[in-house]
């Protein structure tokens, strides 16, 4: 369940995300996904996809009915997080992993992308890629809030992979997150204005 304590714990992990072990802890222990830790065969990768990677993609974790929602980690050859390279890899992996969160790091594990592809029944229409960037120069408060809300304990135990995908799609919706922020800001601003009015009247 989402709590401020969980968000702080996730924030600490994101700030210290320098290796795969921290990523495993994040999903296995903090967000309660099932441990898989299984490499995906390089033989199934196209040459174009394999050329982007320093090693085979890792099926890190899973969730939902039959563990059919997947968390997949890929380490790129480059120090840059190439969006074009990520798209090549994701377009390939989506064919066998339609319900998934994709995570990328650069070669040195100093920068990361958590990548959501909004679900559509037609694979060819899945073109909306949304990313959370994690790195030393990034502001991670919003990232920690979004990722905390992916906690499987906050999703029914018998949820289908589509239901988990839908939760991910909702949490990566920047417009919704922005609207929630402004709604909260407006609420507190209204309270402050009422406080000032009451203060002026009492004076």
Question: Model-flagged regions — what are they?
Answer:
Residues 1-203:
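Short, basic/polar, glycine-containing "phosphate-handling" surface segments that engage DNA
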